[in-house]
């Protein structure tokens, strides 16, 4: 059984923080999950916590929740904020997620890269090998095709772009970006495309961003951030830290207005900062509600190409159905070869060499024609969901 357990949409950030996973514990999580499930993929982003699994034996929904909650040491009171989808619903969920239908910013395409990373990590961890591997391969192809066909770059919108556009409209010109992961890189790229006065990039390892050092970009480590934090008029924070990185005492009470956009989950910024008159603080939930004229255009375009999602769902479900009869097909081919060998051997003992070769070709050709037709019929019935009676008849003909 294929399934996914994750945080429901529109759950408050205060709850999502309690369900966030820490990357440093990833190996431990996977090892423990594989004690209960055949395959596992963990999708852990600033806005999404989902565990995809495949189990070979029947297991109740309560057992699934218990096993997963025990691994992550989550409080049972949080179960009401989680969803569980199985089989086709789980497949549909992944295909829609990778195309941006479930993103807080509709159509935000960072999720495609995040799912690709989760898939590569699962391959590296040897935590997928069959059904989940195929499902993620088809999903990634689906996401790429959807992104190409929709041409979302023509109507860009993301938590990063919305935050920075909002700040620019408010007159911000001096920026600080905390973190240089995928979101941080997008923030820097977006800022460099506008006429801003300066950008302070705060990182733990300066060497990873050394190519950015220039006229308006200054790279500092976290120990140096407070030297300049009160000089900027906008902070974009997007680290993967499990703790607060911008504390209440870091920002002076007196001074010009400072806009802070906290894109992280768990939150990077002390929420008490919003009590200071000079601070305008928005977390990821508030950012996703900022009106953007491109949202409506993107929604219409996404609906136009939703057939790509539906086709990918069907492709995977058909693969599953064919896979179920693959062992029967192998057995039929093996039996075909055995029968052909017996007949050819019998004829070879009776005829001359040249006739024997001709007979071998004819016997093999005739056998292939009938066996291939039987296999086509078996696959066709499998796709219709009525392969059991067909398989029984074919087995009686070829395997008994």
From Swiss-Prot:
Cleaved signal peptide residues: none
SUPFAM superfamilies per UniProt: Glutamyl tRNA-reductase catalytic, N-terminal domain (SSF69742), NAD(P)-binding Rossmann-fold domains (SSF51735)
GO biological process, one term: protoporphyrinogen IX biosynthetic process from glutamate
Enzymatic class: oxidoreductase
UniProtKB keywords: NADP, Oxidoreductase, Porphyrin biosynthesis
Pathway entry: Porphyrin-containing compound metabolism; protoporphyrin-IX biosynthesis; 5-aminolevulinate from L-glutamyl-tRNA(Glu): step 1/2
Keyword Oxidoreductase belongs to the record: yes
Residues at the site labelled Important for activity: 93
Active site positions, chain numbering: 46 (nucleophile)
Binding site for substrate: 45-48, 103, 108-110, 114
Pfam families xref list: GlutR_dimer, GlutR_N, Shikimate_DH
Catalytic reactions on record: (S)-4-amino-5-oxopentanoate + tRNA(Glu) + NADP(+) = L-glutamyl-tRNA(Glu) + NADPH + H(+)
Transmembrane segments: none
PROSITE patterns recorded: GLUTR
GO molecular function, one term: glutamyl-tRNA reductase activity
Assembly notes: Homodimer.
Additional comment: During catalysis, the active site Cys acts as a nucleophile attacking the alpha-carbonyl group of tRNA-bound glutamate with the formation of a thioester intermediate between enzyme and glutamate, and the concomitant release of tRNA(Glu). The thioester intermediate is finally reduced by direct hydride transfer from NADPH, to form the product GSA.
Record remark on domains: Possesses an unusual extended V-shaped dimeric structure with each monomer consisting of three distinct domains arranged along a curved 'spinal' alpha-helix. The N-terminal catalytic domain specifically recognizes the glutamate moiety of the substrate. The second domain is the NADPH-binding domain, and the third C-terminal domain is responsible for dimerization.
Family membership noted in the UniProt record: Belongs to the glutamyl-tRNA reductase family.
Protein name (record): Glutamyl-tRNA reductase
Organism, as annotated: Clostridium perfringens (strain SM101 / Type A)
